[in-house]
Amino acid sequence: MKKILYTTALMLVAAVVLTSCGDHLDKKEMKQVERQSTVTYTINSSQDLIDAIDLVVTYKGKGGINVSDTISDTTWTKTVVNDMVPVKIGLSWSMFPKADSNISKDTLDLMATYIIECNEVTDKLNEWVDFIRLKDFPASKLGALCDLENHKQNCARTKGGRYETPCFIIAPEMIGDGLKYDWAQWRD
């Protein structure tokens, strides 16, 4: 029974969302913007994980439209170029365990990164975001739990105007008796 519930829990979606490129500009500034943003998404995972699960990634494609792709290799990369501002930038993934797969914390070896180039009025924003490997997630970094029914993704500007990016991931430490997975919010 525990294995069935554990497997079912892994079907939850681990969502990661950044922000909008240029969403803070007013209409006058929008006319002066070099209207281009480039995002390169990369997901690296272990062969053990690929063998144990079906991994489906959803990313914000051209125009901010959600595009889904199934990952079958240990490295997946996608570059999206937009000629509009603002544009939504985001990435999420879903894990679906394969039949008879033996999934442990060490199997959850996945790291997502993305590089953002957002051309705006004053300067060019180049931001590189690196999400930790799931299996290396320390209990000391565990932040506020999110309500699964009312889960909201958010981000906040730092003092320098850059975005502090919350990373919502599945935290193995939250399994407890093996019957429950929860969303966790991690910040460096």
Where are these regions (language model features)?
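Bacterial Sec-dependent N-terminal signal peptides
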Residues: 4, 15-40
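Bacterial N-terminal signal peptides that target proteins for export
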Residues: 1-9
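Core hydrophobic alpha-helical transmembrane segments of single-pass membrane proteins
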Residues: 10-14
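First exposed extracellular module after export/assembly in secreted or surface-exposed proteins
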Residues: 31-188
